[in-house]
Amino acid sequence: VCCRQLVRAFIQAGGKLIVWHGGSDAALSVNSTIEYMTNMEKSVGAENAAASTRFYVAPGVDHCEGGVGEDKTDLLTALDQWVTKGIAPATLTAQRVDANGAVILTLPLCQYPQCPRYIGPANNAANDKLRSSYACTSPGVEPKLEI
């Protein structure tokens, strides 16, 4: 109860909150975070939640980092732009880097419940590593594919 009151007060005061969760986190279930965000939205109202919060699930990412997914995302800059310039984040960019820090793959990091879907040309190994080859889609909605 106390946490809900704190979050409600934070949002009512104009606070901004970005929540990120690794989709393959074995330590903390993403389902618990989905439930928390759903309850928070009910508590503060859908309009207030949409104006003050963003929720991202990083597919294939373990607890905080690692896994098969793209675990590098600049959430701090997104939050700073939102707070200082009023530019609310939408789709962010998630990256996978090699041991030397070189980017080897970029994908869109979609707002939950959307997820990235490949829309690029078939049988093109170079394009499957490009953010532009993916679109955020809602569950059950098929994206328009490039042919």
Where in the sequence are the language-model features?
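C-terminal His-loop and adjacent cap/lid subdomain of alpha/beta-hydrolase
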Residues: 1-147
